[in-house]
Amino acid sequence: AYSIEAEVVVMDDASTDLDIVKRNRSINDLEFCRVIESEENIGIAKNRNHLADVAKGDYLLFLDADVYPVSLDFLKKYIDNRVDDGVLCGGMTFRLDGPVKMSPLRYLYGMKYEVKQPQFISLNFFLPASVFQKVRFNESFSKYGHEDTQFGADLQNAGYKVLKIDNPVYHDNGDTSEQFVIKTRVAIDNLVEHRDLLLPTSRLLQLYEKLHALPIGWLMKIPFKKFRQRMEKNLLGDSPSLFIYNVYRLSYLCCKYEEYER
């Protein structure tokens, strides 16, 4: 048998659904588990920092609410591979037969880009509490999106390792395609707002900079301005195109830049 001393701390970021609040509070009835209720929505970055502040252990494992460990020895893998000078990222995968129905666009995007995990993703990572406290999440990221990208960059800039190991979770994301598209735009809003910080690590921003330098770079605004409805019809359908999704993202980014530069 494998025995460890651990606690589970859950953050409820001002849920408005009373059924969810009730279910979350039942966590307090479980041994070594507790839930913290925020009076207002403070955002992902502040949430993670607060969880780290109240946690009692020497190591921290961060998991999003919509993930589930793939392996039965999930915790053991992290403990056996722990490092004192960095963070372990276990990665993610997706399943079509999970407890929630994934939208075609969300599943397609996740399998194409997120499973490969080209950069730090915060839904499943493990690190010493001391390392976290020296870096912490940048709380200027109050909106959805890219706070994890910046945290990963801050870790590396501080000299810490970001190591990937094979210890995935199922990401049972229940967003509809429409919700995912809305989140995409919100994340791009955040990307543009923090463009000076994120330019070194964001491929989308780097691509924009290259196109913007060209005489015909302004043409990339046209797809979102002229064909937004057609593109969204494809993205919300049963057979979405990732090519159209990427054009949608880039074109929206170009339009947002135009707004910020006015």
Regions found by a protein language model. Give the residues of each.
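Short aromatic/hydrophobic "clamp" motif used to bind/position activated sugar donors
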Residues: 60
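Conserved donor NDP-sugar-binding/catalytic core segment of glycosyltransferases
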Residues: 68-101
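A recurrent flexible, glycine/aromatic-enriched loop bordering the glycosyltransferase active site
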Residues: 110-127, 142-144
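Glycine-rich, basic loop-to-helix element that forms the pyrophosphate-binding segment
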Residues: 38-55
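Acidic donor-binding loop at a coil-to-helix junction in glycosyltransferase catalytic cores
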Residues: 144-151
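Active-site donor/metal-binding and catalytic loop motifs
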Residues: 163-195
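Non-catalytic, C-terminal membrane-associated alpha-helical segments of glycosyltransferases
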Residues: 186-189, 203-262
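Acidic donor-binding segment of Leloir-type glycosyltransferases
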Residues: 1-37
